[in-house]
Swiss-Prot record:
Residues 60-78 are cytoplasmic. The keyword Membrane applies. This is Magnetosome protein MamL. Disruption phenotype: Cells have no magnetic response and no magnetosome membranes. Deletion of genes mamH to mamV (amb0961 to amb0978) gives cells with no magnetosomes and no magnetic response. Essential for magnetosome formation. Induction: Part of the probable 18 gene mamAB operon. Its main location: membrane. Residues 1-22 form the signal peptide. It comes from Paramagnetospirillum magneticum (strain ATCC 700264 / AMB-1) (Magnetospirillum magneticum). The gene is mamL. The keyword Cell membrane applies. One of its GO terms (cellular component) is plasma membrane. Residues 23-38 are lumenal. Disulfide bonds: none annotated.
């Protein structure tokens, strides 16, 4: 737990130092406007796309499981 918190603090310090020298970009998503460093915007869009992909794959798997009938319920009578 301490190692996790330490690595998060270390990563936060790296982001702070890197953002002080980065180009600022204004991003507008409808009514939401955000001014952030360029690499932060790229990271946010990457992780949002990654999360959307994971959610869509999980949704497809769940719908396929609901449509399939379980194999053990099939009884063959001779």
């Amino acid at each position: 737990m301490v190692r996790l918190i330490g690595s998060l603090v270390f990563g936060g310090l790296i982001v702070l130092l890197a953002s002080s020298n980065a180009h600022m970009v204004e991003t507008r998503l409808g009514p939401l406007a955000m001014i952030a460093p360029h690499f932060v915007v790229l990271g946010i869009t990457f992780f949002l796309g990654f999360a959307i992909g994971i959610v869509s794959v999980l949704a497809n798997v769940m719908t396929r499981r609901k449509q399939k009938s379980p194999g053990k319920s099939i009884v063959i009578k001779r």
